[in-house]
Amino acid sequence: MLNSPGTRRPVKEAQKYGEDSQKSHSPGTPGPRSSVTTLSASALSDSSSPDTPPRRGPGRPSTPARAPATSAPMMYSRRGVRRTARPAGADTRSSANQLPQPSGACANADSAPPADVSACLRRRSHGDRCVPRSRRRPRPRPRASTAFFQEEGPCGACPGALRPQAGASFRELRGLPPPRPREREQSPPLGAAPSSALSHQGWKNTRCATRGLVNTLVNTGHFLYLQPPAPLIMPYLDDAEVPGNRRSHPSLSFSWLSKALYHVTFLLRIL
């Protein structure tokens, strides 16, 4: 239907597909479309007169390798063995890859028979899109992961994360536990030592040796799922260390003293 003999295709499309009308017609007679689509105006006037033989026959004079822009867009290759019609701007070095193709081996109902085997394979893999046009390289096929790189992930920087509308988070798809709720950054109490300006988690890991040891054991992965989702607040003697009471007891914040007392009692309990 699309390529029926009555259908006229413009010259650009005829160049794009590199169609060969000699496979379905005798070598002396031009195909039904070839006089319309592939010949220039001068060649049309030659072939339309009754006494002049058509220029596409076997006795046609050889065309130079670089055809001028006014000549017919289709050319024969230099060797007389293969008479394959090719676009004028196509690369002549690729003719070594072309094999003689049996008619109808790869011809679809909606596309003209291809000029060579590699174009046939390209056309079968994804559409007519990659068949080389004249003077232009084929479009590169898109990468497989392009769909996931379009938007940033939930964290804003992960390139491979799924879109947030997808329903499942990126970590759940890989079997990871869901991320914990972030700790609130705790403001230091008014009279406190500068060490407590760190967040509770950072203080716990740096200042306390025993608790840091427990943390390293826990974070190696054995007890990963047994940790509570939010860190527990250690029962200091100082009320100002509890986040709810921070603002209400600014005068009681002897935090370094209370921490020292707590660790002394903690170590005594262990021993």
From Swiss-Prot:
Biased composition (Polar residues): 92-101
Positions of disulphide bridges: none
Domain of life of the source: Eukaryota
Region Disordered: start-end pairs: 1-202
Basic residues biased stretches: 121-142
Compositional bias annotation for Basic and acidic residues: 10-23
Bias-annotated ranges (Low complexity): 33-50, 59-73
Listed name of the protein: Putative uncharacterized protein encoded by LINC00271
Organism the protein comes from: Homo sapiens (Human)
